[in-house]
Amino acid sequence: MDLLLTNARLVTLQSGEMGYQPSTPMSIGIKAGKIHYLGIDTALAATKQIDLKGKLVTPGLIDCHTHLVYAGNRSNEFEMRLQGVPYQEIARQGGGILSTVYGTRQASEAQLLEQTLPRLDGLLASGVTSVEIKSGYGLTLVDEIKMLRVAKSLSQHRLVKVTPTLLAAHALPPEFTGRANDYIEFICQEIIPVVAEEQLATSVDVFCESIGFDLAQTERVYACAVDHGLRVKGHTEQLSNLGGTALTARYQGLSADHIEFLDRAGVEALARSSTVATLLPGAFYFLRETQLPPIELLRQFGVPMAIASDVNPGTSPFCDLTLMMNMACTLFRLTPEEALRGVTQHAAQALGYAESRGQIKTGYDADLAIWQIEHPADLSYQVGTQRLFARVVDGQFEQHKECCDE
């Protein structure tokens, strides 16, 4: 073995009720970045051995929806909104999403990296080992590629796995004002082929909404993405029920995200597919929304529910995935087990890694979070304390610098 972790209380999150219950002290043997052994043997030959002294071990957390790479700051808009200034007026004054677009376009790759790393560090401190990162603040070929390159480069600076997603269909750039169909054609003809050829992303996302892109435009992007060998996912049913979730499910999309206005027909479409329902409680909270996602219907039809941070400067400036677990429980009434599975097992499925990440299981990637807590429910219950002891990513052990052993 390359690494042997002993005296670990495992929360494997394998299917079934026992997957959530902490085990008696066990050992985890890791070889070539994979979980090679799970059992009680503490004397296996290993290059490195660490006694965890009864600490709780879960799969590494997976943040399956973020907009982590961007430049600029929109805290002034936060103040304006709290003073009652409508979004339309904020946008007229140069704010809103286009202010982030302008800032991101002007920033170099080095500047984007410098601004992104502190946000990434926040996620890692909450136990994240895998993170999805979308483009969408460039809206030109050059700037979308710039964002994706910065996203991919993060794993060279931090111990983390990055899954880049192309979100050129995030907003209408000023150059295409009044010409949404032309912009969609530009994405399909100019951006997607280059991103696919250079392997800068594994999937393509679309903001399918009344203030974004309609169903026909979304399907045009989906069809193009699939033609280029890329998976699809969607921002759907956040502000209205357009049918974007059902469309995403029809294309066997990885996930449909937000879904506050999803109806029964949309839930049934998800149930007939492998598409995951991703809940984004941070945006719900920050925007003070009132329309709850249909949690009971999703449970009734057995649709897997992932949870993500949706880190972005406008609607979810939160860099702590355990805070999102707490919000999912308090705002959406998920159980702590559903919340933990939502940032591990189901988040892995939402990124296409259901057979390699999100569970502690032999043959799976050795991606682990090691905690100084008694029970997994503590992750959803308490926020703000230094609970993370260490992370393991592809078998590499990294102790959290803010946490000390007892």
Swiss-Prot record:
Q: Which GO terms describe its biological process?
A: L-histidine catabolic process to glutamate and formamide; L-histidine catabolic process to glutamate and formate
Query: What remark does the entry make about the cofactor?
Result: Binds 1 zinc or iron ion per subunit.
InterPro entries annotated for this entry? Amidohydro-rel, HutI, Metal-dep_hydrolase_composite, Metal_Hydrolase
Disulphide bonds annotated for this chain are none
Q: What is its main location?
A: cytoplasm
Per the UniProt record, which EC number(s) apply here?
3.5.2.7
Q: What is stated as this protein's family in its record?
A: Belongs to the metallo-dependent hydrolases superfamily. HutI family.
Spell out the protein name for this chain.
Imidazolonepropionase
Species name: Vibrio vulnificus (strain YJ016)
